[in-house]
Amino acid sequence: MTRPSEVLIGPYRYPVVFAADPALTLQPNWGNISHDPHRIDVMARADEMRQRAILLHELLHGIDEQIVIGLSEKQVLKLAPALLELLRRNPLLVGWLMEEPDVQF
């Protein structure tokens, strides 16, 4: 499956860049989210599963920015891989969540 080139978080479009960004190599992390301008960087040299966890990690930061939950970095570090694992191990759940429900009035 093709990696996403952008994601929507609330009303904002965030380009997703998978690159060996020199700015990231100087930091102790593998990804970054910027809210002005909107952009998510994911370290391209990470293996594919780690890239997915990194992107989900940055998305959680983006959601937190939008709805002001106040998640700590430690909480995001624990939530991202747990959520990724939940979604990957339950494809029927993911399919059901993504379906348009039959609306009856």
Where are these regions (language model features)?
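Metalloprotease/metallohydrolase-associated module, dominated by Zn2+-dependent proteases
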Residues: 1-49, 66-105
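Active-site recognition of the HExxH zinc-binding catalytic motif
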Residues: 53-65
